[in-house]
């Protein structure tokens, strides 16, 4: 997938789910399910409930996303 097709949104983690999945509430009040990106997993960046994050989504499935950044 090329970078032009990716949609980026900010949101807040509301719930931790099994298998390293997270329920995220986006700034536009949509709720999605997201997983951490491979680079975040590799660098052991922890994501907890209440963290403000950046999520990448594909325009084809707007219910799932990938967490790419955790704000400090």
Curated annotation (Swiss-Prot):
Cellular component GO terms, alphabetical: cytosol
SUPFAM superfamilies (UniProt xref): Nucleic acid-binding proteins (SSF50249)
Residue span, S1-like domain: 1-72
Alphabetic keyword roster: Cytoplasm, Initiation factor, Protein biosynthesis, RNA-binding, rRNA-binding
Record InterPro entries: NA-bd_OB-fold, RNA-binding_domain_S1_IF1, TIF_IF1
A UniProt-annotated Pfam family: eIF-1a
Family: Belongs to the IF-1 family.
PROSITE patterns: S1_IF1_TYPE
Location in or out of the cell: Cytoplasm
Keyword rRNA-binding: yes
Subunit description: Component of the 30S ribosomal translation pre-initiation complex which assembles on the 30S ribosome in the order IF-2 and IF-3, IF-1 and N-formylmethionyl-tRNA(fMet); mRNA recruitment can occur at any time during PIC assembly.
Stated role: One of the essential components for the initiation of protein synthesis. Stabilizes the binding of IF-2 and IF-3 on the 30S subunit to which N-formylmethionyl-tRNA(fMet) subsequently binds. Helps modulate mRNA selection, yielding the 30S pre-initiation complex (PIC). Upon addition of the 50S ribosomal subunit IF-1, IF-2 and IF-3 are released leaving the mature 70S translation initiation complex.
Gene Ontology MF terms in the entry: ribosome binding; rRNA binding; translation initiation factor activity
Main location: cytoplasm
Organism: Bartonella tribocorum (strain CIP 105476 / IBS 506)
Protein's UniProt name: Translation initiation factor IF-1
């Amino acid at each position: 997938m090329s970078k032009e097709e990716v949609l980026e949104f900010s949101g807040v983690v509301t719930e931790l789910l099994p298998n390293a999945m997270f329920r995220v509430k986006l700034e536009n009040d949509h709720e999605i399910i997201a997983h951490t990106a491979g680079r975040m997993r590799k660098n052991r960046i922890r994501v907890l409930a209440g963290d403000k994050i950046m999520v990448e989504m594909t325009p084809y499935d707007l219910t799932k996303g990938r967490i790419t950044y955790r704000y400090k």
